[in-house]
Structure formats: C-alpha cells, structure tokens
Amino acid sequence: MSASVLDITDLKVSFDTPDGVVEAVKGVSFSIAPGECLGVVGESGSGKSQTFLAALGLLPHNGRAAGAVRFLGQDILGASPRILNSLRGHKVSFVFQDPLTALTPHLRIETQMMETLIQHLKMDKPAARARCVEWLERVRIPEAARRLRQYPHELSGGMRQRVMIAMAMMTDPSLLIADEPTTALDATVQAQVLDLMEDLRRDTNTAVALITHDMGVIARMAQRVVVMRRGEIVEQGPVGALFHEPKHDYTRMLLESVPRISSSRLGAERAPPQD
C-alpha cells in the first residue's frame, strides 16, 4: 500500500499554440501524505493549477502531459476516461475559487448535491437527500433542509462556498484539491471557511492540496509547502522551516510581500515581479 495519497514525479505539461509549443510545467515532483495539507504557492501563471489539472486528465485538447502520477499507488497519468471519471468527484474532489460559477445557476442545491451521491455512491434519493442535509449542517449552514431547496443565487458567497465544500467532502474523498478557495470572499468569511476546511481535514484525515498565491493562507493551513515559479518548483519543505529560513530569492520575495502590522510600509514594492 502506498504511503502517499498522491505522488507526482517529473511531471511536464505543454500546450500546442499557433505560435508553437508552450511549456507550462517543467518537470515537477512532490507527494501528499494522508491527512496532510500541502500548500502549493506561486503567482498567476506559475503552473500550480495546471499541475493538478494534468494529473487528473483535465487538460484542454491542446494540452499534453508526461511523467508519472500515482494516486493511492495506481498510475493514473493517461488512464482511461472511465477510470478518471470514477475518481473525480469521488475519491478526488475539488473546491474552486468562485462557487457561483462552479454551481449550476438554474438547478437547486439539492439536485446538484444529490447527483454526486447517486452517481458515485449509488444512493437512492431519500438516502442521498439525508446525507446532503447532514453535510450542510456539518459545514455549519443553518436551516439545512430549507437551503437545499434554494438556488445558488439565493445564498451568500460564503454560504455557496460552504455548499461546495460539503459537495467535495460528502463522498469521503482521499484527496481534496482546493484551488484559491477563499480568494473571492471577504476577510471575515475567508477566515471562517479556512477554519472549516482545517476542522474537516483533521476529522476525516483527508489529504488537501491547497493552491494559492497567499503565503498567509499557507502559514495558517499547510504543513508543507511547494513554491512554484515559471513552471518549476524553486523550493519545497516544511512550512516552519521555509518561512524562517527560505533558501530561494523568489520565496523570500513572496514572504516579504505579505503585509505585517509591525511594518512601517506594507512592502508592495517588494512583490514578486510578474512574468
């Protein structure tokens, strides 16, 4: 049995474009252990999201991936659509940045939640609905049964993201991939959602890949961190060691761009340069 939930080795991702081949990810390697939160941090265009999309067969038609990806010991890079579909939304779940676009606007919350349970866990409708209510309560949504009958636009942004977390966790996944899960939320709601995700990770022993540009979120949530720039990993290691003794200039710039109350200037001029 594999000691890691996810093992990525020398993964390369490229895209065919009218101007030639663009290399988005250039041979990255890392792993995620059961119950661990791995932070993957870098500016926009660093390749962090493309790494996970490639690993799970979600690249667009012009994308290509090479290397090795093992999920629970099984090689899944290039696996058949049937195998990948059985994993996605079941053993591997996603939480995206904007829940309003991730949810289907013309379908009630219960329809969208129950579909996952009926398809992947083969539940009947009464059992699926009961599990939906249970998970909405677990993510601290009041009046859960009533909320199930509502449409996405009738919920606040924070409540919609809680629905997405419930949908992601209710199939008992081994891996949760959270791609900028709180960027679209205000600071107070962001803190509540991060606390919720941390509580669920501890309660369920689910591995979490937390993709973000925010080193403050990494410090709050992750045990280990991978720093990406221009499609490459420039540094990785335990969060405490990396924050206290960063080895790479880019990591230091990311850390220095985080506002500190004690700073006389917020350090925006030290933010990492955009490519």
Protein language model regions, located:
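Short catalytic/signature loops enriched in Gly
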Residues: A3-S4, V21, P142-L148, Q236-D275
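Conserved ABC transporter NBD signature motif
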Residues: R64-D75
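Conserved ABC ATPase "signature" region
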Residues: Q74-D75, A127-R146, L255-E256
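A short, proline-enriched helix->beta-strand linker immediately N-terminal to the Walker B motif
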Residues: M170-S174
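Helical segment within the ABC ATPase nucleotide-binding domain
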Residues: A191-N205, G216
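A short, surface-exposed alpha-helical micro-motif characterized by mixed small hydrophobic
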Residues: I218-R220
